[in-house]
Amino acid sequence: MTRLLAAVAFAFGAMLAPHTPAHAQTASLANPASLNERAPPTFKVKFDTSKGVVVIEVKRDWAPNGADRFYNLVKNGFYDNARFFRVVSGFMVQFGINGDPKLSSVWRTAGIKDDPVTQSNKRGYVTFATAGPNTRTTQVFINFGDNTGLDGQGFSPFGQVVTGMNIVDQLHAGYGEGAPRGRGPDQGRIQQEGNAYLMRDFSNLDYIKKATIER
């Protein structure tokens, strides 16, 4: 089975990153190779979710390739309206499949090179999912607990939740593990049908309304 596993308080004076027009975001997202901007050494991402606000602080030196990919995806709106489609209590919550199947499809093979594991997969730490060497694309998970067993498998955290971990704990977990092992959404169908499938068959899933970068 594919090993896909699978943040409002800021310092005074924090500034929003420059806004990218929606049409430019869509065009950029259709060309993964064009989204190669280097991320700042440290930055924060605010998720306005259906349950409340979650803030993730990213430190580029933890996992440079992962931090750069996350920065570019957030800046260009990839995670807006994305569902938390896999929520396994005590383990992790996973997200990162775009709700538009056309966009999702162009990112499926846009893998980045692996980063060394410099941090442990502790509670609140944020990591890209992977299906093997150099296969990280867009899917991300937040650890509910201390999942140190993932460290030796190449799962390299690039950030951590600094505000709103209590919100993460409240994300709907009623569907459990995904199909075929559980009664949750099938990742293949999410890729093929997008949010239409999730809204129809898994309407209780929480989601990211808007993701923004804050310095």
Model region roles, listed by residue range:
Residues 1-8, 15-18:
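Bacterial N-terminal signal peptides that target proteins for export
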